[in-house]
From Swiss-Prot:
Family from the record: Belongs to the three-finger toxin family. Short-chain subfamily. Type IA cytotoxin sub-subfamily.
Gene Ontology, cellular component aspect: extracellular region; membrane; other organism cell membrane
Tissues expressing the protein: Expressed by the venom gland.
Gene Ontology BP term (one): killing of cells of another organism
Organism this protein belongs to: Naja sputatrix (Malayan spitting cobra)
Protein name, per record: Cytotoxin 4b
Database matches in Pfam families: Toxin_cobra-type
Length: 81
């Protein structure tokens, strides 16, 4: 009986994902990293002249403003960048 109860508790914790954190792609989208506390956005940075080639990806707390040369795209779901 104790084993069954322990199993139910473990399954509940795994299913609820109590320690939810955001996952963002690294520069190569096959790899991702778990964002630290406070960094609740994923971002992708690329040069305006080459919009299909991202320069940097990762976690960030506030989305930076784009400029004439660099564009930032931010989102808040897992691996959205």
């Amino acid at each position: 009986m104790k084993t069954l109860l322990l199993t139910l508790v473990v399954v509940t914790i795994v299913c609820l994902d109590l320690g939810y954190t955001l996952k963002c792609n690294k520069l190569v989208p096959l790899f991702y990293k778990t964002c630290p506390a406070g960094k609740n956005l994923c971002y992708k940075m690329y040069m305006v002249a080459m919009p299909k080639v991202p320069v940097k990806r990762g976690c960030i707390d506030v989305c930076p403003k784009s400029s004439l040369l660099v564009k930032y795209v931010c989102c808040n779901t897992d691996r959205c960048n």
